[in-house]
Amino acid sequence: MHPAVGRPALGVVGFSLGGYYGLGLACQKPKSIAAVVSFYATGRGKFAEAQAAFLGHFAEDDEFEAAADVAQLEQHIRQAGKPVAFYTYPGTKHWFFEPDRPEYDPAAAQLAWERTVGFLQRELLR
């Protein structure tokens, strides 16, 4: 980590494939990553080694992420003893957070944003 960062741990926010990489990064760099926010992405990793808290935002109708995979990831993180909160947004599709996409859902995006900001404040500003 660059010395200019000034904090011992970082938060990671990733969308789709970026969320997948964020989940993996928490396992690969546990001393550096304190919080992970994944938008519509699941992943694998040795979550017992992670030191992060996890927040996930998922679409109800996602052609790329099955609800069973989301539930399995949440269970895996929880069983590893890590703080985790996953939300599924009714009536949404993959990319619901991104205003330049046809799947954009303003109400769901606003709620996800509020949850994300609160989560990062709690986890990173303690």
Question: Positions of the model-derived regions?
Answer:
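N-terminal cap/leader regions of alpha/beta-hydrolase-fold enzymes
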Residues: 1-126
